[in-house]
Design a protein with these regions (language model features):
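N-terminal basic/disordered segments at the start of proteins
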Residues: 1-43, 64-66, 118-121
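Cap/lid and interdomain-hinge subdomains that line or gate substrate/regulatory clefts
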Residues: 2-4, 46, 59-62, 70-209, ...
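Short acidic, glycine/serine/threonine-rich loops at helix termini
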Residues: 18-20, 93-97, 124-132, 183, ...
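Glycine-rich, highly charged phosphate/nucleotide-binding loops
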Residues: 35-38, 58-72, 342
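A structural-propensity feature for long, helix-poor, extended segments
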Residues: 46-54, 308-310, 392-422
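Conserved, well-structured core segments that form the ligand-binding/active-site neighborhood
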Residues: 134-301
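C-terminal structural cap/anchor segments
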Residues: 302-305, 309-361
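Conserved, well-ordered active-site substructure
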Residues: 355-356, 364-413
Length: 422
């Protein structure tokens, strides 16, 4: 089975988010974690999502990794390229979303592409080209305080244009999207006739995403958040195997929960876990830097906690003021690296001790943990929350993982994940 759709995602949780949407829409989907090596076999699936860690990478590195991933997918038979970024368009005015999209356009021969990070189920909508997080414009939402990609402008055309060297970015508004796929295609043609090659597309609900999916049929390249994953599988109607696309093997056992995200959503989830009596140990990056806290010590605590509880959470999660204080002391890059390295080492110790269920919060943390565990392929299972599925390694002695973007999930996400674990 050769993939019909090949996706290049700029972080690990974003990749699982998209894979979740594709599986929900009926495509048998496999996640390929990390930059692929040329010559590696492309997994047999209807959709393959290559999960990179390029969201905050320098432009040349992000472009190179993304092109390598797409070439690998294309050589494996993928017919359409889907460049997946965050539903909050995480980047900076000098970020890499525009350059990666431009490079993929050239590689795929696309003369036009769309940008639609909307994910209405998670409160991310676009109106008149402005991105909203629930009722708040992006620049008024907690994303304005993101430690790596503070989002200070909700106008996606204005945010994207500098990344494209000042190229004009068009808009296909909700009034057009409401009219369906034919109207969207006509708007695309009108923009192309004016020499405009890039356009933001409004989306306020799943019907809009499905219409955009139909309008995107046959396009060499689309760029979007995960939401468009609901609309695209239908364009391959008649070519899909059908049946359940999200079945996983039974795994069982206790779960280790690791949280490196400092988003407002994850802070609330950690607080709720603690309030509900969940086993919790807060990791202090300063203590790790000073040698007063170690991965070995953290795992010792977790292993003891898991003797009496179905799940134990180690969290480096802190509110924005505390994050800034740590970054001022250690530097932003060192602080992030300490968290990722320490939680990854704890995960390695847990796996060696027989733990086969992991729940991880934070895109960078998820990437670090899966890399440390040597996991390169994941089958996609049932949804825990919008954008977050359970996944499992392929082969004997499977390990189950839930990889959560920091911003996703209800306050009870950790409890919900634990209760639904395979």
């Amino acid at each position: 089975m050769k993939p019909l759709l090949g996706a290049v995602a700029d972080d690990f949780t974003g990749a699982t988010d998209l894979a979740n949407m594709l599986a929900r829409a009926g495509m048998r989907t496999v996640l390929a974690l990390g930059a692929p090596t040329p010559g590696d076999p492309v997994p047999e699936a209807e959709a393959v999502v290559a999960a990179l860690k390029s969201r905050t990478a320098p432009v040349p590195e992000a472009v190179d990794e993304s092109l390598t991933a797409w070439r690998w997918l294309a050589e494996g038979g993928a017919e359409q390229c889907y460049f997946k970024y965050c539903s909050t368009f995480d980047s900076t005015p000098k970020g890499n979303i525009g350059p990666v999209a431009a490079a993929l356009m050239e590689e795929t021969g696309a003369d036009f592409t769309v940008y639609c990070p909307a994910f209405p189920e998670a409160g991310r909508t676009i109106y008149r080209g402005h991105l909203f997080v629930f009722d708040q414009p992006l620049h008024e939402s907690p994303l304005k305080d993101h430690p790596l990609t503070p989002m200070t402008d909700a106008n996606l055309m204005r945010w994207l244009s500098p990344q494209l060297g000042g190229a004009e970015v068009g808009l296909i508004g909700a009034d057009v999207v409401d009219q369906g796929a034919d109207a969207i295609r006509a708007a695309m043609d009108a923009l192309k006739a004016k020499g405009i090659r890039h356009a933001v597309v409004d989306a306020l609900n799943n019907d809009h995403l499905e219409a955009l999916g139909r309008a995107s049929a046959g396009m060499p390249l689309v760029t979007a958040g995960s939401g468009l994953g609901l609309g695209l599988p239908g364009t391959f109607a008649g070519r899909l195997a059908g049946g359940a696309a999200d079945a996983l093997p039974a795994i069982g056992g206790p779960a280790l929960l690791l949280s490196g995200s400092c988003s407002a959503a994850t802070n609330a989830q950690v607080a709720r876990w603690e309030a509900d009596g969940g086993a919790l140990l807060r990791m202090d990056p300063l203590a790790v830097a000073e040698g007063r806290s170690t991965a070995e010590g953290l795992w010792t605590w977790a292993s003891n906690a898991l003797k009496a509880a179905p799940g134990a959470l180690i969290a480096a999660t802190q509110p924005p003021d505390a994050v800034r204080a740590v970054q001022q002391t250690l530097g932003t890059e060192r602080a992030a690296a300490l968290v990722e390295e320490t939680l990854s080492a704890v995960a390695q110790a847990a796996r060696a001790a027989g733990i086969r269920r992991f729940i991880v919060a934070g895109g960078e943390t998820s990437g670090a943990v899966t890399s440390a565990l040597g996991i390169s392929r994941l089958a996609v299972g049932p949804q825990i929350a919008p954008g977050v599925p359970w996944c499992a390694t392929i082969g004997d002695d499977p390990t189950a993982l839930a990889l959560k973007s920091g911003n996703f999930g209800a306050e009870t996400f950790f409890q919900d994940a634990l209760e639904s674990a395979p």
